[in-house]
Amino acid sequence: MFDGLKKKLNRFRNDVEETAEEKAEAAADEAESDADAEAESAPADTDNAAVEPEASEPAAADPDADAVGDADAGSEADAVDAADAPADAESSSAAVEADAESESESAATPEPDSEVDAGADTGDEPSGEPTADEVEPRESLASDAAKAALTEEDEDDSSGPGRLRRAAAFATGKVVIEEEDLEDPLWELEMALLQSDVEMQVAEEILETIREKLIGETRKQVESTGQLVSEALHDALYEVISVGQFDFDQRIAEADKPVTLIFTGINGVGKTTTIAKLAKYFEKQGYSTVLANGDTYRAGANEQIREHAEALDKKLIAHEQGGDPAAVIYDGVEYAEAHDIDIVLGDTAGRLHTSNDLMAQLEKIDRVVGPDLTLFVDEAVAGQDAVERARQFNDAAAIDGAILTKADADSNGGAAISIAYVTGKPILFLGVGQGYDHIEKFDPEQMVERLLGEDE
């Protein structure tokens, strides 16, 4: 069921995922190259910055020179004293020589803190091996350059303002989905939806929801881009499929008995068979039913519905061909009230919305019987034709819900997706075969999961 549409939706999911991942990887590679280039240039700048302060420092030998000058001054003073006091000459001379030797040793062996100054005084070139003080600034600058390459906005219009943002997100385990990533896949999805008989207005709504959900989003580290796209598709489909949805079983359970259901639609779409299927459906839930044949114009209509009634052991209310449909269904309601029957299932003649006389009959049934629910029946395989007919019937005589037959033969799913959004009235059941049990209660969530499930 709906396999063709399912494949198209999966193709869209894969296309978006591949496009986003490929562009993110390319942006990350480019940003990494930029970071490497910045890192390579950083050590040279660091060396230059380290050398300039050494050259600009004042000569560190000045304190020693001052010390030597002081020693010379002391020697001269000692010499004067020696001249004035010849008796102390020998001791003074010994003291001067000791001081001179001490100063000489001090000048020849500089303190550890003056190593750089000594190198500056002697003019020696610095060692080729970087010192511990030089390594740390180099690594810091390289790290800063790499971070800047990933986080700063790129002002080059040729690469796009989002390139580095995408690269940064990819580097942290995330992928940013940009509008350009969706342009081609969304166009292909739109064509796929239209080819699957999804109504134009519905297709546009689906695409707009996907844009809102995806553009500018980043996937979490715990999920894939495909999962993010699947979530957007899920929300977009669910929003259009679930319009007007209500709990059919609860509505029947809470309604005053007998509950009257009227079935309408064009000829040959399976209204009568659907009535028989619902009779079996209600029987399983413990409800009693009576069938009323309001299709009084079609030859053989009484015989067709009688076969179903006999097969299911149900009471049938019918008039002669050409009778008043409203009168037949009214008699069905009277019988249900008299025999404590829970539900009346009333058939009507197939008609087009342009058949004024037949549409007037529906209006009369509404006045005379006051049905609890009027259900539109059409074929799922009719696609957009079914959608348009549902719209027209709803405009002419308001419907409460729709039933799609032959859903098991429909690979497109366009009608199933579109009818609720177009009419504002929900799809309630899907016919999925010829047997009386071959009818499914329509569940929007289950429908979306079926469309987005993995290919078998």
From Swiss-Prot:
Its EC number is 3.6.5.4. Gene3D superfamilies: P-loop containing nucleotide triphosphate hydrolases, Signal recognition particle SRP54, nucleotide-binding domain. Residues 1-26 have a biased composition (Basic and acidic residues). GTP binds at residues 265-272, 347-351, 405-408. Its main location: membrane. Keywords: Cell membrane, Cytoplasm, GTP-binding, Hydrolase, Membrane, Nucleotide-binding, Receptor. Residues 40-62, 82-97 have a biased composition (Low complexity). GO terms for biological process: SRP-dependent cotranslational protein targeting to membrane. This is Signal recognition particle receptor FtsY. It comes from Haloferax volcanii (strain ATCC 29605 / DSM 3757 / JCM 8879 / NBRC 14742 / NCIMB 2012 / VKM B-1768 / DS2).
